[in-house]
């Protein structure tokens, strides 16, 4: 693939880094602590979710199903990728010696793309579900909401996996990245690398943008109903407000964690002159920027469960007591029905 890499597998690029430099960059204790905190956070969120699903309404049950899918994805992402990265940081093995055929690198590249895109796609799916639930409450059969939610989660997983497998089918490449402890898509000039990098960045960015648009409309609708001429019995339920607060939190976390990396990938593959030399080497600045943005993106897997844990109704009521004292409504449907009748 690269002129001076004929004796190596297709996942190896030139990378000038000493063992001492790798030790300074890749702290095994930090990586292990990071993974343990993330795994514990997601397990805690799963236990809270299991309790919340008992006796929940149809709309809330569907939303909690999406949340379960999101937390499970984050947990498995930390578990699988963390096992590889933490082992590499402790042992400091040479990837060429352990994985000359690039099988491990290809596997890690697939799961990095899969577990990276899934939270963004699930966020967009959750935003769509809440948008329809708030603005079109009669457009879907309530009895099928939970089954439909799991089907949607499965489709998201399948779509992200299909995208992650593209480099194994010849569209782009997965290569070992600086400082030699992880694999990801290649920020090169090859048409396949450019196409795959742009596809990954655009799909992630569109998911974030779609979440922002639909969540904004949903929040505006809730505010209109809440502050309109509706009686107390026609105002949004506490759970409607709770779900939107959690969804907005998930969207903000995903935007802060992932948008820098997505923008950086798009800018780098489109950069002129190219960021990667003909020999397959990136500048040290570009390599370090990619590593920093990737580390920021991985915080999404730790922060997601805490958005649900901290933004539950019981916690919100501590800071906003009015939420527990005001009259609880039956649903949004009376007000929305009246509006649709008028129009």
Curated annotation (Swiss-Prot):
Gene Ontology terms, MF aspect: thromboxane receptor activity
Write down the membrane topology.
Multi-pass membrane protein
Q: Keywords of this protein's UniProt record, alphabetized?
A: Cell membrane, Disulfide bond, G-protein coupled receptor, Glycoprotein, Membrane, Phosphoprotein, Receptor, Transducer, Transmembrane, Transmembrane helix
Alphabetized InterPro entries for the sequence: GPCR_Rhodpsn (IPR000276), GPCR_Rhodpsn_7TM (IPR017452), Prostanoid_rcpt (IPR008365), Thbox_rcpt (IPR001105)
Has UniProt tagged this entry with the keyword NAD?
Answer: no
GO CC field: plasma membrane
Q: Which Gene3D superfamilies match?
A: Rhodopsin 7-helix transmembrane proteins
| Residue ranges annotated as Extracellular topological domain | 1-29, 88-106, 173-193, 271-289
What biological processes does GO assign it? adenylate cyclase-activating G protein-coupled receptor signaling pathway; inflammatory response; positive regulation of blood pressure; positive regulation of cytosolic calcium ion concentration; positive regulation of vasoconstriction
Task: Give the quaternary structure.
Answer: Interacts with RPGRIP1L. Interacts with RACK1; the interaction regulates TBXA2R cell surface expression.
Main function: Receptor for thromboxane A2 (TXA2), a potent stimulator of platelet aggregation. The activity of this receptor is mediated by a G-protein that activates a phosphatidylinositol-calcium second messenger system. In the kidney, the binding of TXA2 to glomerular TP receptors causes intense vasoconstriction. Activates phospholipase C and adenylyl cyclase.
Name the chain's protein: Thromboxane A2 receptor
Species per Swiss-Prot/TrEMBL record = Bos taurus
